[in-house]
Amino acid sequence: MSMVYANIFLAFIMSLMGLLMYRSHLMSSLLCLEGMMLSLFVMMTVTILNNHFTLASMAPIILLVFAACEAALGLSLLVMVSNTYGTDYVQNLNLLQC
């Protein structure tokens, strides 16, 4: 494994550890998810460019579309929760309430 792949994999693992450790605020969870998506995008792009996969060149673009949708939904959830509860603590959320 080259150093580029190792660094990208390390960035993904650090984002995953941040997501698992800092679960108290919704904003920090969203930032860790964005870090994971960014490292996946870079890993896919580097792999496709190194292996000359011309048919799979659309996959990173599709991943970016899903990441943008995830970010938009996450930010709208953050705004809704902060307007309703006045804070962005994850433990205040009860998913059983309507």
UniProtKB/Swiss-Prot annotation:
It holds the Pfam family Oxidored_q2. It catalyses: a ubiquinone + NADH + 5 H(+)(in) = a ubiquinol + NAD(+) + 4 H(+)(out). GO terms for molecular function: NADH dehydrogenase (ubiquinone) activity. Keywords: Electron transport, Membrane, Mitochondrion, Mitochondrion inner membrane, NAD, Respiratory chain, Translocase, Transmembrane, Transmembrane helix, Transport, Ubiquinone. The chain crosses the membrane at residues 1-21, 29-49, 61-81. One of its GO terms (biological process) is ATP synthesis coupled electron transport. It is found in: Mitochondrion inner membrane. The keyword Nucleotide-binding does not apply. PANTHER family: NADH-UBIQUINONE OXIDOREDUCTASE CHAIN 4L, NADH-UBIQUINONE OXIDOREDUCTASE SUBUNIT ND4L. Core subunit of the mitochondrial membrane respiratory chain NADH dehydrogenase (Complex I) which catalyzes electron transfer from NADH through the respiratory chain, using ubiquinone as an electron acceptor. Part of the enzyme membrane arm which is embedded in the lipid bilayer and involved in proton translocation. This is NADH-ubiquinone oxidoreductase chain 4L. It comes from Pusa sibirica. The lineage of its organism: Eukaryota, Metazoa, Chordata, Craniata, Vertebrata. The gene is MT-ND4L.
